[in-house]
């Protein structure tokens, strides 16, 4: 069984909500990434999203764009990211790792080789932001051959027909994009988000995890009251880079934010 499914089953059995942090591989410097991954797991992460740096990250706001620029300045590419997963797996064989990014670097790498190497390294799935499921047939077949999961995006504007299509092709869970715009966007409107989320949830065979715009423990808890889980990216990267630039400990800073989110989510999750 894929680690993602094992984790989701365990969360369901324990009536807990998923917490998934996103970091960009190689940011702020390559030697920190594996330590960050372990720190986030210690601080309550259920699933890790590891970003593959790309020069044109169209769905990302300025925080993650700058993170990718910093990683690319260290010449971080697919092989480096996979090596980070390998290093992580030496001491953590259970936490799912999702590789998140854009199609171009993987296309250049070669779909079959990438899937083979990703699974060998210990990755469990991908989120390819610019590959809609309707155009993913070739990639999906390769991923299935190697046992790599495809995690797809859905949003408030996703139609019932498209949700039905996604249901037929997705694995694990769906990434529910809470806002129009880019990662790190402001102004989550919770009543509207809840109503739209529940519409998509009723149409989905898989758990829906909410990402985009979740910045604080309070916000994470409010979303987790109705959602299957939350994904945090830009807020976490802000903590990491601010600590690094202030010559403080990025591990402590990122761990503190994620621990506070974990605690806030668990405090409401036990009542759901």
UniProtKB/Swiss-Prot annotation:
Keywords: Amino-acid biosynthesis, Aromatic amino acid biosynthesis, Lyase, Tryptophan biosynthesis. It comes from the Bacteria. It catalyses: (1S,2R)-1-C-(indol-3-yl)glycerol 3-phosphate + L-serine = D-glyceraldehyde 3-phosphate + L-tryptophan + H2O. One of its GO terms (molecular function) is tryptophan synthase activity. GO terms for cellular component: cytosol. The active site is at residues 49, 60. PANTHER family: TRYPTOPHAN SYNTHASE ALPHA CHAIN, CHLOROPLASTIC (PTHR43406:SF1), TRYPTOPHAN SYNTHASE, ALPHA CHAIN (PTHR43406). This is Tryptophan synthase alpha chain. It comes from Legionella pneumophila (strain Paris). The lineage of its organism: Bacteria, Pseudomonadati, Pseudomonadota, Gammaproteobacteria, Legionellales.
């Amino acid at each position: 069984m894929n680690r993602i499914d094992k984790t989701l089953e365990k969360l369901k059995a324990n009536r807990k909500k998923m917490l998934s942090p996103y970091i960009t591989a190689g940011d702020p410097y390559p030697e920190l990434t594996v330590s960050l991954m372990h720190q986030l797991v210690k601080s309550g992460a259920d699933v890790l999203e590891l970003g593959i740096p790309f020069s044109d990250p169209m769905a990302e706001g300025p925080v993650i764009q700058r993170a990718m620029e910093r990683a690319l300045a260290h010449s971080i590419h697919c092989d480096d990211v996979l090596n980070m997963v390998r290093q992580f797996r030496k001491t953590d064989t259970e936490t799912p790792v999702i590789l998140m990014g854009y199609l171009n670097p993987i296309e250049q790498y070669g779909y079959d080789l990438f899937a083979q190497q990703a699974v060998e390294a210990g990755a469990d799935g991908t989120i390819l932001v610019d590959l809609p499921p309707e155009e993913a047939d070739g990639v999906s077949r390769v991923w299935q051959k190697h046992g790599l999961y495809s995690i797809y995006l859905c949003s408030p504007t996703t139609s019932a027909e498209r949700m039905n299509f996604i249901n037929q092709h997705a694995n694990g869970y769906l990434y529910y994009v809470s806002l129009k715009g880019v990662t790190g966007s402001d102004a989550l409107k919770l009543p509207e988000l809840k109503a739209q989320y529940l519409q998509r949830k009723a149409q989905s065979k898989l758990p829906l995890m909410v990402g985009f715009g979740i910045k604080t423990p309070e916000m994470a808890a409010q979303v987790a009251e109705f959602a299957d889980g939350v994904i945090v990216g830009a807020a976490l990267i802000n903590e990491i880079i601010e600590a690094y630039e202030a010559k403080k400990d990025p591990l402590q800073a990122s761990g503190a934010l994620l621990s506070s989110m974990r605690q806030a989510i668990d405090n409401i999750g036990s009542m759901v």
